[in-house]
Design a protein with these regions (language model features):
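Short intrinsically disordered terminal tails
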Residues: 1-7, 79-83
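Short stretches within intrinsically disordered, low-complexity N-terminal or propeptide regions
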Residues: 10, 37, 41, 72-75
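N-terminal regions of proteins, emphasizing targeting and processing segments when present
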Residues: 32-33, 50, 54, 61, ...
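A structural signal for well-ordered alpha-helices, especially hydrophobic packing surfaces
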Residues: 26-29, 57, 78-82
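Charged, low-complexity interaction regions
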Residues: 30-44, 58-68
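N-terminal acidic leader/helix
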Residues: 3-35
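Repeat-associated, polar segments at repeat-unit boundaries in modular proteins
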Residues: 62-83
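Short amphipathic alpha-helical heptad-repeat segments
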Residues: 14-25, 41-53
């Protein structure tokens, strides 16, 4: 994504996508998502979504959006090791 400021619509879409990443990370960790996938696939999904959240949280054009769930998922995802 470029350094240009995002529109309100883009911010809303990005925030929604962040919620999907949070849900996936938490779901993989609690076993409710990707349970039938290999440990490598689960780990890869968590790692990619953690990276996505880190990039998005670091953006400076957010307004009053609450990043608590994203930051919690980043922490949980970094601690996760698929087995």
């Amino acid at each position: 994504m470029s350094d240009e400021a995002r529109t309100a619509e883009q911010l809303a879409q990005d925030y929604t996508a962040m919620g999907h990443s949070v849900d996936l990370i938490n779901g993989v960790i609690d076993g409710s998502q990707m349970a039938d996938e290999s440990a490598e696939d689960r780990q890869g999904a968590v790692d990619r979504n953690v990276e996505h959240l880190e990039l998005m949280v670091a953006k400076t054009d957010w307004g009053s959006e609450d990043m608590t769930a994203a930051n919690s998922a980043i922490t949980a995802g970094k601690a996760y090791t698929a087995s």
